[in-house]
């Protein structure tokens, strides 16, 4: 069903192509792009960080002062504009908050004024929208960084004719990060005082994600299964009761996959391309992966893993059993950086098994693509995974994902045993090292004993698609439901 074009203000802390630390940035680029292709007037708003790419393309529009509180200083800022693949991007320039080497932290230490910084983003986004005469139908917020926006629409701007018809939605990309800060950081948002008890984390602290969830008109998680998990104590990171209060307004919408960048038939990073009808290029990619990572070029199954080295990604589940698995005739390639202690353990194992394990302690786009193409299996033993993108890439590249059945992983991977006809990979449930090892051994057994079925599952995987236009249709419905609220 076609809907009338909407004006959408999409506020995010990062956008792929300009500045990125994680998966939020991928969505913040793709979703506005595909919404615009449907005819909606989408404007992205984000901070003008020091690290923004293509800074010289930004055009200064206006300089303004953000009102704060009687007796307290207003905050000066400037609004810049640039284009991102045909979508208008507004950059909020306030050097005292955003002229820093990184986005959120330096040397693994969060900036102590992050609450104040992103309170400014929320207040300035609405102020700037009014200064630019862009009256949005929908303000689309993303994660804790924008959690104050829905509250400000219902307080500061409740009787502002400019926002009379504006409704807000918030997307939950990762509820583990909630934006909890001391109350005094929000001096520029006096409205918090009347709502502090409701949006507090504990005495004297404010929870920005909680604020967004309580006051947005509609809420979505980035996969249906993750939306269900947010209603449980195991999956909501202490916010189950808050999500339960808003259960009627919560839905799960699976992220799409950007097949323009992740398609083995047109991947410029690969030494050879391939598709579902001709996998010869995948074999060349496998040999290239072995050569580049220093592994012997032999005919063994390769298990790949590309991730941040964190507990969330399940690296601590893999480490206790990796040496046992490496005694099988396999090779493992792990690419990523993060926790130094996890990296040190992987480095030690790589030295013990130089012909079986390659560990590359950095992230590199080209190598990430080569792992997806050259491996036979892709490991994602995540403790939680709101949506996940690498399993989608793996499916497209015919590299069977081996995942823990949580969040979006459960929505996107069909287990070999659970449904042999529709299978696209391997799933396991319990977050223990031995259960993970069992799943890895099961995948190895099937690879060796049933190559015909392996080829069928590989074809199933490569024919699976998670297209953004399908997701956009669901977002459009959520916007309509939000606008229907009075």
Swiss-Prot record:
Entries under Gene3D superfamilies matching the protein: Glycogen Phosphorylase B
GO BP terms, alphabetized: glycogen biosynthetic process
GO cellular component entries: cytosol
Keyword Transmembrane helix: no
Catalysed conversion reaction: [(1->4)-alpha-D-glucosyl](n) + ADP-alpha-D-glucose = [(1->4)-alpha-D-glucosyl](n+1) + ADP + H(+)
Pathway where this protein functions: Glycan biosynthesis; glycogen biosynthesis
One annotated GO molecular function: alpha-1,4-glucan glucosyltransferase (UDP-glucose donor) activity
InterPro entries, alphabetized: Glyco_trans_1, GS/SS, Starch_synth_cat_dom
Record flagged with keyword Glycosyltransferase: yes
CDD domains: GT5_Glycogen_synthase_DULL1-like
Family: Belongs to the glycosyltransferase 1 family. Bacterial/plant glycogen synthase subfamily.
Name by which UniProt lists this protein: Glycogen synthase
């Amino acid at each position: 069903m076609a809907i009338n074009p909407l004006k959408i203000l999409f506020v995010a802390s990062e956008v792929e192509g300009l500045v990125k630390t994680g998966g939020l940035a991928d969505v913040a680029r793709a979703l506005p792009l595909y919404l615009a292709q449907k005819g909606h007037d989408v404007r992205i708003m984000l901070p003008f960080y020091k690290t923004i790419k293509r800074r010289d393309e930004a055009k200064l529009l206006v300089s303004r002062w953000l009102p704060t509180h009687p007796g307290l200083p207003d905050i000066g800022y400037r609004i810049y504009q640039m284009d991102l693949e045909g979508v208008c991007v507004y950059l909020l320039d306030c050097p005292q908050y955003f002229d820093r080497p990184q986005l959120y932290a330096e040397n693994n230490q969060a900036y102590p004024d992050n609450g104040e910084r992103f309170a400014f983003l929320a207040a300035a986004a609405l102020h700037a929208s009014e200064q630019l005469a862009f009256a949005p139908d929908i303000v689309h917020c993303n994660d804790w960084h924008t959690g104050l926006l829905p509250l400000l629409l219902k307080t500061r701007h409740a009787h502002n004719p400019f926002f009379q018809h504006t409704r807000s939605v918030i997307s939950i990309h990762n509820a583990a990060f909630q934006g909890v800060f001391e109350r005094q950081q929000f001096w520029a948002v006096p409205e918090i005082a009347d709502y502090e008890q409701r949006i507090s984390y504990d005495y004297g602290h404010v929870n920005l994600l909680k604020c967004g969830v309580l006051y947005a008109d509609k809420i979505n998680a980035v996969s249906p299964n993750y939306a269900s998990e947010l209603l449980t104590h195991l999956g909501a990171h202490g916010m189950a009761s808050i999500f339960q209060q808003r259960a009627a307004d919560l839905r799960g919408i699976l992220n799409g996959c950007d097949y323009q960048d992740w398609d083995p038939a047109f991947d410029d990073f690969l030494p050879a391309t391939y598709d579902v009808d001709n996998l010869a290029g995948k074999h060349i990619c496998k040999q290239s992966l072995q050569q580049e990572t220093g592994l012997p070029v032999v005919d063994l199954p390769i298990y790949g893993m590309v991730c941040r080295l964190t507990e969330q990604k399940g690296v601590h589940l893999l480490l206790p059993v990796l040496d046992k698995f490496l005694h099988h005739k396999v090779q493992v390639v792990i690419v990523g950086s993060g926790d130094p202690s996890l990296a040190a353990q992987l480095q030690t194992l790589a030295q013990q098994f130089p012909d079986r394990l390659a560990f590359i302690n950095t992230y590199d786009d080209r190598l990430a693509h080569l792992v997806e193409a050259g491996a036979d299996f892709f490991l994602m033993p995540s403790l939680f995974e709101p949506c996940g993108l690498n399993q989608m890439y793996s499916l497209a590249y015919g590299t069977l994902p081996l995942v823990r059945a949580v969040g979006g992983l459960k929505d996107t991977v069909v287990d070999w045993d659970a449904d042999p006809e529709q299978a696209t990979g391997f799933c396991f449930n319990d977050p223990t090292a031995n259960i993970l090892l069992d799943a890895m051994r099961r995948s190895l057994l099937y690879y060796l004993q049933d190559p015909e079925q392996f080829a069928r599952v590989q074809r199933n995987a490569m024919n699976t698609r998670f297209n953004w236009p399908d997701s956009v249709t669901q977002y459009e419905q959520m916007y309509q439901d939000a606008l229907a609220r009075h």
